[in-house]
Design a protein with these regions (language model features):
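Intrinsic-disorder/low-complexity regions
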Residues: 1-2, 84
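Bacterial N-terminal signal peptides that target proteins for export
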Residues: 3-26
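Hydrophobic alpha-helical transmembrane segments of integral membrane proteins
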Residues: 31-32
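N-terminal signal peptide c-region/cleavage motif recognized by signal peptidases
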Residues: 35-37
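N-terminal, motif-rich segments that launch catalysis or mediate targeting to/interaction with membranes
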Residues: 39-149, 156-270
């Protein structure tokens, strides 16, 4: 299925506010818009990805996730999903994204991710730590990063273009206020729904079928979405833009959640 032609899901009328291949295919839904902060999917988006993944863990994987999380009582996959943004630093900032040359969405590690310093490399690195015999502390840290980075790579503009820093420098107007395209995709489209992460996760749950994937595949998918004619609006986010891209945004959230579950089940469910 073309991930730019995902059938919309009707929301309730009350809606307001390692080289391993993992699996999943495209899916789902509809949404509206309002611009906000710039930090990957924002809190709500990362929580949705984590909650969708949590619901799809196998018993063995869940037991190992719970064992790792027990080092910090009260933590869940959802609560750790934003840890990497809350503890962000200049050193780790490049691990949240990968930038492509405009017009070329074929991932080349040497060009796009030197020394593994991008979100694709970071996913592989953290997955390797999680699968290793490292200390429980190191594996919990890897889990925190992995939950977050898998969400990041499914936000299209976290695999955007060098020349505008993934849409951060592309200024526009959205709902009578200044913003940038990266912020629109990070949080704006989700925030305008005024749905909790629980409610949005319920809307997205159970709509995907497994299919092979890798972090490289996810990054190239995101880049191709950004490369779609019309993805960059003419400095104004219009209702027609929202109508065209709202299913894409929620489809990426759903893909991120399902793919994260597949990855965790593969690593921890053995």
């Amino acid at each position: 299925m073309n991930y730019l032609s995902i059938p919309p899901l009707a929301f309730a009328s009350s809606c307001k506010k390692i080289g391993v291949r993992y699996s999943i295919s495209a899916a789902v839904v509809a949404v509206a818009f309002m611009p906000l902060r710039v930090c990957a999917w924002g809190v709500e988006g990362h929580q949705v990805v984590a909650q969708l993944a949590d619901a799809q863990l196998t018993p063995k994987a869940r037991a190992k996730v719970d064992q790792l999380l027990s080092q910090e009582p009260g933590q869940t996959l959802v609560s750790i999903s934003t840890w990497a943004d809350e503890h962000r630093s200049p050193r780790y900032a490049p691990l949240h994204y990968v930038n492509f040359p405009r017009g070329d969405c074929v991932y080349q590690a040497q060009r796009d991710c030197p020394d593994g310093r991008c979100v694709v490399g970071a996913i592989h690195q953290e997955a390797a730590v999680l699968a290793s015999n490292a200390s429980p502390e190191a594996r919990l840290l890897a889990l925190k990063y992995l939950v977050h980075f898998v969400g990041d790579v499914h936000q299209p503009l976290h695999a955007g273009f060098h020349d505008d820093k993934g849409g951060n420098t592309y200024q526009l107007q959205a709902f009578m206020r200044g913003s940038n395209l990266h912020a629109v995709w990070d949080s704006g489209l989700i925030k305008h729904l005024e749905l909790s992460a629980d409610a949005l996760s319920s809307q997205l749950a159970g709509r995907l079928k497994p299919a092979p994937w890798t972090p490289e595949i996810a990054a190239e998918e995101s880049c191709r979405i950004v490369s779609t004619p019309g993805f960059y609006p003419d400095r104004l986010v219009t209702p027609s833009y929202i109508e065209q891209y709202q299913p894409v945004m929620l489809g990426r959230l759903a893909l991120g959640g399902s793919r994260l579950a597949v990855m965790l089940n593969d690593i921890l469910g053995r």
